[in-house]
Amino acid sequence: MSFKDLRSFIDHLESQGELKRISHPVDPNLEMTEIADRVLRAKGPALLFENPVGNDMPVLANLFGTPKRVAMALGKEDPLALREVGELLAFLKEPEPPRGFKDAIAKIPMFKQALNMPPKTVRNPPCQQVVKTGEEVDLTKLPIQHCWPGDVAPLVTWGLTITKGPRQKRQNLGIYRQQLLGRDKLIMRWLDHRGGALDFKDFKEKHPGERYPVVVALGSDPVTILGAVTPVPDSMSEYAFAGLLRGERTDVCKAISCDLEVPATSEIILEGYIDPDEMAEEGPYGDHTGYYNETDSFPVFTVTHITHRKDAIYHSTYTGRPPDEPAMLGVALNEVFVPILRKQYPEIIDFYLPPEGCSYRMAVISIRKQYPGHAKRVMMGAWSFLRQFMYTKFIVVVDEDVNCRDWNDVIWAITTRMDPKRDTVMIENTPIDYLDFASPVAGLGSKMGMDATNKWEGETDREWGTPIVMDQAVKDKVDQIWADLGIDDAPTL
């Protein structure tokens, strides 16, 4: 099942008991965060606040608050099915010519999917049913959430920022938080390595002093939203990838004030520009780390047009100490990363980003070890292969007999198969998340790799331990007689 707009997905979630409408008045200032946080931690439904205090526009929260709902947004019922998305991405990143007739037949479905890539331009789009310009533009009339007591101002959190660089044919979609600065101004907090910031940098070099057109879409269809947070190849538009996932082309329309294309079924569109000479101090804000971050200077986004659907819905979220919505999104997208990594490193058995590690700061990888030093090669590969892992501070590599998603197994491997000096890799002066205040310098810090695999000849001179394993015949016999032993239900092993 695919969803052409946010509303059809909301209806589907409600029919499945995955969305709750809240008619009681709730304040976007702090109260929504507290309610959404409690519901998310209880693995509860998405929330539609129908009567936000001081506003008549409903607010949608916790949309992707469970891995199951992330899968549902992509037409899947099980998060594990998202590995199919990863297989598609792996193919797109490194397409291989068919190795023969049978292989060509097997690849036909992927080639057919590729035909659905280009977005489709539509007229009279829903997102432009209402158009506001000039004095009508007033961001303070949107129910923008003020998430935490120490936040400096309300924060736009789920906006898809649409940019285009002078050297790129494709448009870039990214999600960057935006601080409310005034009636028509937001602070665009994009880090230097993100697509929007790179497009802006290229534009400034080619057109010094000129205004840079930017559009922000709120409440787009769920597939396009998820396309913006998925590791799409740099040469490919997120619109095209969303079309692949949906099985049909993404509907877009031309923005009113510039040539950028926007998702046609979005709830709200903010159009405007960034003046390269206008910067503002952003923050502090509570973030996905569970702490308030430092302030810093970022570009100011001036909004010249607001367009929206009739009876528009405002899509929002909060970030805080895991679990939060980004952490749940990370759990689901974990399954997307596995096939991509396996294509480059076939020896990888599984890959896990623990949500309590802020989604990406720690990774555990199980491998089929084949030679001395193999674990270190995999560490280096994981750090460098995908941009998403450049901020991963800790990588633990374990053998295939260890479940990398079970901390009991992982801690056992670390404490029995590691010598701290021999098996720990420390790398200094590497890129680190700007929000990581534990690093000695903002944006620059160290990484640690831990080789918790069995050691081979050349890695140790000692006789290595043999794991204790019961004979299978004995286990089978005990299974047969268990009911006669008078013991409670057999434990699951």
From Swiss-Prot:
GO molecular function: 3-octaprenyl-4-hydroxybenzoate carboxy-lyase activity; metal ion binding
Keywords from the UniProt entry: Cell membrane, Decarboxylase, Flavoprotein, FMN, Lyase, Manganese, Membrane, Metal-binding, Ubiquinone biosynthesis
Binding annotation for prenylated FMN: I175, Y176, R177, R189, W190, L191, R194, G195
Co-factor requirement: prenylated FMN; Mn(2+)
Reactions catalysed, as given in the entry: a 4-hydroxy-3-(all-trans-polyprenyl)benzoate + H(+) = a 2-(all-trans-polyprenyl)phenol + CO2
Location (main, coarse): membrane
Any Gene Ontology CC annotation: plasma membrane
Annotated Mn(2+) binding sites: N172, E238
Family that this chain belongs to: Belongs to the UbiD family.
Cited function: Catalyzes the decarboxylation of 3-octaprenyl-4-hydroxy benzoate to 2-octaprenylphenol, an intermediate step in ubiquinone biosynthesis.
Name by which UniProt lists this protein: 3-octaprenyl-4-hydroxybenzoate carboxy-lyase
